[in-house]
Amino acid sequence: MMETPRDPAASRYEHAAHGLRRSDLDPDPIKQFSNWFTAAIEAQIRDVNAMSLATAGRDAKPSVRLVLLKGFDQDGFVFFTNYESEKGVQLEANPYAALAFYWIELDRQIRISGKAKITSREESQTYFHSRPVGSQLSAWASRQSEVLDGRRVLDARMAEMTERFGDKPIPLPPHWGGYRLKPDTVEFWQGRPNRLHDRFRYRRQTDDTWLVERLAP
């Protein structure tokens, strides 16, 4: 086997004794998510809105990457991206996706799965124009997931977009916008000693009712 600086199997972290009981949970997983998200913010966790996004296209080969949560409500969890990126192409072919948050400081993980839909153009525009100018320009300059012949290509495109738009308002690119993932399942995981973690899964029954189940760790 390849030698590594440290054996991955030897890396162990013993979770604290914080428990999670059924009575601790809100009947609504979105409200429960809000409670945990607020606690993570109060714990000053860096990049608290960073989440893994897993997608798979027609070939069923999964891809995963980190994206940023930009909003959530009863309709789902919102993130923004380039529609022509790998994730955008995969979501067009197969809209089912999964999200995961891991806040190690709180020994907590949240898994969410469901169907993603493109947000309205108005919602995408509102968020796009709230971004720093440099981020707006980069959405035009970067053809996400394209193979580049060096950094200079990207820098040249950025310079071109800067000159093109100047001090004028930067329009929303047609290839850029948001997705909203409406959850079918939401799982809350609380780390416990001896790997006997607490896991609760919400499964959607109707638009506004959920079945809550305790799962073996």
Across the structure, where does each feature detected by a protein language model lie?
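Binding-site signature for planar aromatic cofactors or substrates
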Residues: 1-217
